[in-house]
Every structure is written in structure tokens, then in C-alpha cells.
Amino acid sequence: MVPDSDKKKLVILGAGSHGLEVLSIVDDINRESNRYEVLGFLDDDKNKHQKEVGGVPVIGSLKSIEDFPDVYLITAIQGIDNFWKIEEILKDVCKDAKRFTTLIHPSASVSQRSQIGFDCIIFPHVTIGVNVRVGNHINILPNSVINHDSQIGDYSILTSGICVSGRVSLGKRCYLGSGTKIIQNIQIGEQCLTGIGSVVLNNLPNNSVVAGSPARFLRKTVAND
């Protein structure tokens, strides 16, 4: 166990339901290694300020990061309504990559021959295979599998029960709906969204919204300004 004096001080960006799930992951990590001390949440919803989420206080807005210069950060503001905006939000509040940590749930299976970037959250029962490259600011939700030699682009969200086959390339700012399956050797462009249960059999250009089995093009996502 890590002595209290050596624990990493952590602030969670986002005090919504996703933030509470991230807090639960920290709790599970601490049961095994006592690694983190959570100081609080930062959230732009002023109605949450000075209140508690899961017993942890909401201590300010995202801009309040400047008031906590010596703590680690983890981002928990991702969602289907704003997945393409996360990059710009984070650029506005913190440009120092060294301040972000990565959380890997103890039940996840992550190959030692994979690479995981910063500000990533690997949820329970995720499997990440050999030679997988996971970028930065990425969430991989429970029971998802990323197979060998695949690449996951920055700021992407992979929701529950995803299956990414071998040698798949996923671009930046993508959102994969629950249960999405992608066959091997597929290339998916930036800022793409798949509906729940989609089965992707073909390459997808940038800004594609697809759904169904097999996945069919529906429309384009909102352009990233």
C-alpha cells in the first residue's frame, strides 16, 4: 500500500454521472494500492458548487484548475452530446499534458505490449491486446475488447461492450455506441459516431454517423470548428 504522504492528489473534471463512475474506479484502485487522494470535482454547473457528489465536494468550475497547480487531473466530461467538443474544452482549461493521469481499473486486462496515453480511463473488464495504441483523453467503458495492432485516436469514447477486431484504425473524436463491432483491417475517420449494436464492415470517412447491422451511413456529424 502507498503511504498517505505519497498518494497522488487528484481532481476530477466533471461532476455528472460519468464523474461519479470515475470516482468509483478510483475507489477500486485505492482498495488495492491506496494510490490517490481525491480532492474534489470541477464542474461548470454552478448549481453543483459547494455540494457533494459521492461524498466528494465540487470545488469550482473547470477554469479553477489554475487554483490547484500541483494536483493530477482526470477528465470525466465526455458524452454523446459533446464528444466532438472535448478537445477544445480541454485546450481552454489546461494545456499541460503532464498534469493528466490515466486510470486503469484493476479488473482490466491490458497487454504489456500495448501503449496507453494520458488522461485515459479504462473501465472494468476491458481487454486491450498486444501492439494496441490507445491515444490521449480516451474512455473505454466496461466489457469492451480492443484486439491486436489496433489504434484508437485521441478524445474518443468507446462505450460498453465494444469489440474492435485486429488492425483497426479509429480516428480522433469518435464515439462508438454500446455493442458496436468492427471487423479487422477497417479504417474509421475522425469524428465518427456509431449507433448501438452497429456492425461496421467497411471503412468510414470523416464525420460519418452510421447504424445497423451491417452499419449504414445516416448523416454527417457536426463539423469541429
What is the predicted role of each segment?
Residues H18, Q78-N82, R216:
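Short glycine-rich anion-binding loops that position phosphate/pyrophosphate groups of nucleotides
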Residues R219-D225:
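Generic C-terminal helix-cap and adjacent flexible tail
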Residues L39, V71-Y72, K172:
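Conserved acidic residues
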Residues K46-S109:
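Phosphate-bearing ligand-interacting subdomains
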